Amino acid sequence: MKREKKETINVGIGFATGRKQFLHLLKSYFLNWQESGLIGDENIKINLFVAYDLKYRGTKKADYTAIPGAISALIENTFFIGSREIAQAQYELKQYGIADEENAELLFGKGYAAQRNIILYYAIKNNIDYLLFLDDDEYPVVVTKNKNVALWSGQHVLTKHLENIA
């Protein structure tokens, strides 16, 4: 990736998920980022934010946290956000007078939007420069038809975003 600035940027990748295949998806994205040259750029620090819901599909915490060592070694920081972390964030908002009980529950309660909110909250608290949300049901490939043949092609989603915002 080409940038005029050579300063280090902290990039947050946020996944709001409840799907068992999350780790397979994460592996696909990391292979994609390595292929694009993003991994290995000393000026880009990848920070992973995973807000998971164990009740959505009856999953276990390990379905999200068992990241292979080869991938973990490439991540600057990893934040796993489950019900305990959400309760703590709600408590903080109430304790500091930022939100009452009702609004803390609305902001960080249940559902996809609340998961994205808690990821954003964590990203702000951890000085993330850029945050990109990726869906847990979309792989970094696209299928196109060429003369009656389906072609699978990789897309460099994160690289393209950074080229245009960093």
Regions found by a protein language model. Give the residues of each.
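Short aromatic/hydrophobic "clamp" motif used to bind/position activated sugar donors
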Residues: 131
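Active-site-proximal specificity loops/subdomain of glycosyltransferases
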Residues: 57-126
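Residue-level detection of beta-strand scaffold positions
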Residues: 49-51, 119, 128
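Active-site acidic Asp-centered loop
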Residues: 134-137
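Conserved donor-nucleotide/metal-binding helix-loop-beta segment in metal-dependent transferases, i.e.
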Residues: 139-166
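Short alpha-helical segments and helix-capping/turn motifs at coil-helix boundaries
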Residues: 26-36, 114-120, 155-165
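N-proximal low-complexity "stem/linker" segments adjacent to membrane-targeting elements
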Residues: 1-66, 95-103
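Residue-level preference for long, well-ordered alpha-helices that form the structural scaffold
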Residues: 22, 108, 154-158
